[in-house]
Amino acid sequence: MSKYKNSSLLNDQGGVRQPSLSNGSSVLGISNQLPPNSLFHLFSTNNQQSTTTPTTVTIQPPSSSISTPSPTTNNTVSGGGGIQTAGSSTSSASSVVGGGGGTTTPTNSNIVVIESNKEDDKECGTILMEINKGIRSGNLGEQIESILFFSHLIKFHPSPLIVNSVITRLSDIFRTTSNTVKYRILKVFQECSSEIHKVSNIEEVLKRIHSVILSNDPIARSLSLRVLGSVPHLIADKLYIHHSIRTCMQSHDQVELEATIFIMDKLCEISPLFSDSIIEKIHTVIQNVETPPITKLKYTRLFRHMHHSHSIATQSKEMLVGLLDLYPSVGFVSVILDTLTNLSLKHILYIDDHIKFLKNYGFSDSRVVVKVIALKCLQKLAITSPHSQFPIIEIFNIIKETPSKSYREIKYNALLLLSILSQSQYTKILELNQANDNDLIDILYQYSLDYDFKLSELSIQTLVNIIVESTDNNNNNNNNNNNNNNNNNNNNNNNNNNNNNNKLIESILNQTVNNICVILKTQFTTSTNNNTNINENKSTLNKTSVFLKSIIRLIKKDPKPLKSITTTIISLLNEIPYSILKSLFHCLSMCIPMNKSVLNQNGWFKLILDYLNNLIIKENSVQLINNNFNNNNNNNNNSNNNNNNIINRNNNGISNGINKQDCKYSIPMSIFMCIFKTFDENNQKIQEITEQLLPLIQYILENPKPDQLWSCYNLAQLSQRHGFHKIAMVIYSTLIHKVESECNYLWLKGLLSIATLENEISIYSITTNKNNTNNNNNNNNSKILNQLSNYHTSIVSLKASSQQERSLQFQEDFILLHEKYLFNILNLKSFLLECNDDGNNNNNNNNNNNNNNNNNNNNNNNNNNEILLKRFLSKSLIFRQLEQKYQLLLNIQSKSINHTVPLDTKQILESFIFSCNLIVKLIDLIVINKNNNNNNNINANGINHQQEQRYQQHQQSQNQELINYFPLFKFCEFIQKKLNQQHSIPSSSSSSSSTTNPISFLDQVLNGLIKIPMVYPSSFYFKF
């Protein structure tokens, strides 16, 4: 047992933790069938130390090795809390190793790195010695187990010295060992193929592996070919290996032949030399009568890599076209057409000719499989080269002329091809539609209502692509016409064309929306479909289905149809199965930010709330009846059968209302998301909706089912991300007593304190809005200021919940910045109140004083103005610094997760940056007004023009998916537009604009910023 303690293989309960290949051990993924011998013990302990050191290295004297930090070392490294940066680690290194001078710090740190590298080399040397002992063993199992550790050694220590010694040793073993060990060495080469280029004597390694090809064993030759095929870049110009591969093509052993085709496929892809030397031989083998048909097909696929030069590509194309006449069977035609398509994709000059070839050959063939293959090849070409000359009329004719009851695969692939082409060739489709009396669009209308949902969703996608792309094109044309005012005749013609296109697009839009509503009523309701059709549609309609993506894209371009689509979905709440309804509400949640009032009308919210009551309470009541029935059966085994039949009938009558398989133990997160996104802009509405939702949530918490507590935690996160902090507070207060880990308890405690604090701040902002007097505002502001200190208590809990493998630095920085943000806004509000009081007092004094004292009063006013200007500039500097800190947090977050910061996190941080920039701009307006400067253009020291231009570009961007719909950003955009309107007023009307007081306007803006609900980004919550 001491042996397992040293190797860190004890689990939390004190038992031995066996390594597992599926779950993975702490370092290696070793199969649990292998015994934990001394080799595994040595390798696991050494690698546990080496793999944990990159993030938590503790600087020690050179004699000691690098190990995981102890509690004492944590105190010395972390110091002031948080993870130390590179600068702090180097300074500590200089203090330990010796010499405190600034010039000697890099040298001392290099000494420490060299010492650590020496320790790693010693550990690797020890591991290599143990592995060599296992390889020299006479037991085959120990040999294979030892070779297994070579790949792990290279992964965890990919230094050139280790890679060179390991690969050289494996090549020696490969030459003389059995086929079983050869196969294990092949796996090592395949797993470490990206590291083999570090070998210095690669020529010796290749020669030792190549020597096995000359043996009499076909299995050994095939293993040698596959080992060489795992490193094709190293043998791209090795002619002796190329010659051996061509020799192996004559083999009659199937295993060796497949290995030969494998290495030929790898080499033809990267080696022009090998491709040029092998193309004629491949063509000869395919034409040979003795070659099996399956082997001919495998050799035919090699032609897709013959694109390294124009001559090779042309020769390959001619050979493949000749093979079509030689082998007209369906299997050969399918492979040859696919190979020709892949070859054309690599050689762009052949794309247009290949499209014509597919149209003439594929569409004229009466076989269904050939037509489907031709359409699939055209789909590949449409994705790569969407602006080529595709036969659109012929594609519509295939859809129209193909029988409806059969050959649905042809229709599906033809519609899929049209959906791809409609994103780029929408103008051509509309022109051909007008030339054919609207016949093409009518075909899409017809198939959008087809009983086959796959065909209908592709038709809807094609129509939506035409609408969206044509709308963007018309908007661009209108902008160009407005910019070019010289050519009046051309402008009139363009305007007429745009008007005609707009009318056509509007009619297509209306018909498409009507068809979407018809699909919702006919495809997914239980009254119009049998169970088989609904089950088929369940599998196709999910969150990523083409139908829902098309609806989202259409609504993001034009939010008007959202009302009719929402009306249809809500009217069918009791008829659509819950599994489909989840996906539909998820689609609505993506569309609601474009039109937040869509659920807040016609009593739709009440209908949704009633549906939630039926869904949650009835489903749980059915489950309770089932549990009670099972308990009665266990306790009363001798009960009457008639009573059991009555209970069964009652149970079935209740369960018929809701399908238990659809909503088993689940919480309708998509419905809650729709509600949260609808009312997340108003604190007063948030409190009203919260009171209506709390009974449902408390019912779930009081009667939890399996996995529902985790769903409740996700619901709390979702509510906290949309300003419903009271819901999060109720859930966290229940979950905090149900976790086992102390770390999770502290994490929930921190989230609970944050939710409680945000809920109290929102309540104070509501009372401020109702009682809009100065005294009440001051009292509420002082209450909010008193609550800000509680942010630090939540930070303490979050810090206590942090662990070595996860950092909560972003959470701490975000909370601290938000606390500073609120504090500075409230501080600025109190300062503005003082300015208003001082201004009123000065006006009263000026009215009461005599004319003799006017000069003295003017001097005093000038002095007061200078003091106020300095204080205003200091406030402006504070918000600029706060803006820079938010920008720095955004940059750090994007770098820490490989430049893939979540969209909501980026938009929330940009919202705070925008608000700080807006406050700076308003303060600068006040400063200019105090200086009696009528110039509305503010210099660079007042406004961050780069930030303003970035948000204007952000607003005008074509990609609607990146628009920021968070309430804070929308409020700042509204204020920005107001300011731009004021600046656009000409100087002659300055008297009208001067009536607006900048100080009072800034005070109103600050009140609005306080009242906006606080939202938290998704990056704030880590994954368990």
From Swiss-Prot:
<dbReference type="GO" id="GO:0032039">
    <property type="term" value="C:integrator complex"/>
</dbReference>
<dbReference type="GO" id="GO:0034472">
    <property type="term" value="P:snRNA 3'-end processing"/>
</dbReference>
<comment type="subunit">
    <text>Component of the Integrator complex. The core complex associates with protein phosphatase 2A subunits, to form the Integrator-PP2A (INTAC) complex.</text>
</comment>
<feature type="region of interest" description="Disordered">
    <location>
        <begin position="472"/>
        <end position="502"/>
    </location>
</feature>
<feature type="compositionally biased region" description="Low complexity">
    <location>
        <begin position="473"/>
        <end position="502"/>
    </location>
</feature>
<dbReference type="GO" id="GO:0005634">
    <property type="term" value="C:nucleus"/>
</dbReference>
<comment type="similarity">
    <text>Belongs to the Integrator subunit 7 family.</text>
</comment>
<dbReference type="InterPro" id="IPR056516">
    <property type="entry name" value="INTS7_N"/>
</dbReference>
<feature type="region of interest" description="Disordered">
    <location>
        <begin position="842"/>
        <end position="863"/>
    </location>
</feature>
<protein>
    <recommendedName>
        <fullName>Integrator complex subunit 7 homolog</fullName>
    </recommendedName>
</protein>
<feature type="region of interest" description="Disordered">
    <location>
        <begin position="1"/>
        <end position="109"/>
    </location>
</feature>
<feature type="compositionally biased region" description="Polar residues">
    <location>
        <begin position="19"/>
        <end position="36"/>
    </location>
</feature>
<dbReference type="Pfam" id="PF24436">
    <property type="entry name" value="INTS7_N"/>
</dbReference>
<dbReference type="InterPro" id="IPR056517">
    <property type="entry name" value="INTS7_HB"/>
</dbReference>
<feature type="compositionally biased region" description="Low complexity">
    <location>
        <begin position="85"/>
        <end position="96"/>
    </location>
</feature>
<keyword id="KW-0963">Cytoplasm</keyword>
<dbReference type="GO" id="GO:0160240">
    <property type="term" value="P:RNA polymerase II transcription initiation surveillance"/>
</dbReference>
<dbReference type="GO" id="GO:0005694">
    <property type="term" value="C:chromosome"/>
</dbReference>
<dbReference type="GO" id="GO:0160232">
    <property type="term" value="C:INTAC complex"/>
</dbReference>
<keyword id="KW-0158">Chromosome</keyword>
<dbReference type="InterPro" id="IPR016024">
    <property type="entry name" value="ARM-type_fold"/>
</dbReference>
<feature type="compositionally biased region" description="Low complexity">
    <location>
        <begin position="44"/>
        <end position="77"/>
    </location>
</feature>
<comment type="function">
    <text>Component of the integrator complex, a multiprotein complex that terminates RNA polymerase II (Pol II) transcription in the promoter-proximal region of genes.</text>
</comment>
<keyword id="KW-0539">Nucleus</keyword>
<dbReference type="InterPro" id="IPR033060">
    <property type="entry name" value="INTS7"/>
</dbReference>
<dbReference type="Pfam" id="PF24437">
    <property type="entry name" value="INTS7_HB"/>
</dbReference>
<feature type="compositionally biased region" description="Polar residues">
    <location>
        <begin position="1"/>
        <end position="11"/>
    </location>
</feature>
<dbReference type="GO" id="GO:0005737">
    <property type="term" value="C:cytoplasm"/>
</dbReference>
